[in-house]
């Protein structure tokens, strides 16, 4: 099993058969990427409940059974979601070209796909765009990218809880930073 995971989830195979090969241009530890993904998946598949996990069910069954619907598809959440749609402003764009001030950023795993210099530029721009107390959430999958800017404070306990209970089990870290708060700063 180890050899299969190392072969299939290694950057060479993933670049040919899965994700765009350029997604691996900036992976920190390319030679061990298969081993790293296997370790993350092993944890997720053995420590995170799978029966009602929408990600595992969709990956395995190509559908969501009724017992494993994501929150946004559950009937009991429809009215709540509808009532809060005005709170969300979706911007699909390059962070560096964005203008304005924001309270929350869901950055997914964008930092996987850029150079270290681009990461620093995007970090500076994020700080420029952040209102005091703004939060930024992002994932590390194969890279280990952490904000070093003193204006951004890692919410370590929350980040560890989210990482350890992340139902999208294939990420190394789920990180939450707050702009302008210095009470819980720590290095991962």
Task: Annotate each predicted stretch with a short phrase.
Residues 1-81:
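Class I S-adenosyl-L-methionine-dependent methyltransferase module
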Residues 87-93:
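Conserved SAM-binding strand-loop segment of SAM-dependent methyltransferases
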Residues 93-106:
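A short acidic, Gly/Pro-enriched loop at the edge of an enzyme's catalytic core
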Residues 101, 114-119:
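Active-site-adjacent loop/helix micro-motif of nuclease/hydrolase catalytic cores
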Residues 108-111:
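Residues lining the SAM
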Residues 119-132:
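A short glycine-rich, Lys/Arg-flanked "PGG" loop and its adjoining helix->strand segment in the class I
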Residues 132-144:
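Conserved beta-strand signature within the Rossmann-like core of class I S-adenosyl-L-methionine
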Residues 158-188:
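Core SAM-dependent methyltransferase catalytic element
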């Amino acid at each position: 099993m180890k050899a299969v995971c190392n072969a299939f989830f290694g950057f060479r195979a993933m670049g040919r058969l899965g994700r765009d090969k350029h997604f691996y241009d900036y992976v920190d530890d390319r030679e061990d990427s298969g081993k790293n993904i296997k370790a993350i998946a092993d944890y997720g598949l053995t420590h995170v409940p799978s029966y009602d996990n929408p990600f595992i069910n969709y990956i395995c069954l190509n559908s969501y059974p009724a017992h494993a619907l994501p929150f946004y598809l559950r009937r009991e959440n429809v009215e709540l979601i509808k009532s809060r749609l005005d709170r969300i402003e979706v911007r699909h764009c390059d962070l560096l070209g964005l203008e304005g001030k924001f309270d929350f950023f869901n950055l997914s795993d964008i930092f996987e796909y850029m150079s270290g210099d681009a990461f620093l530029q995007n970090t500076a721009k994020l700080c420029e765009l952040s209102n005091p107390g703004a939060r930024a959430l992002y994932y590390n999958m194969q890279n280990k990218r952490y904000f070093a800017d003193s204006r951004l404070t890692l919410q370590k306990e929350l980040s560890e809880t989210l990482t350890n209970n992340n139902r999208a089990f294939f990420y190394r870290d789920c990180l939450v930073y707050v702009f302008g708060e210095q009470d819980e700063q720590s290095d991962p």
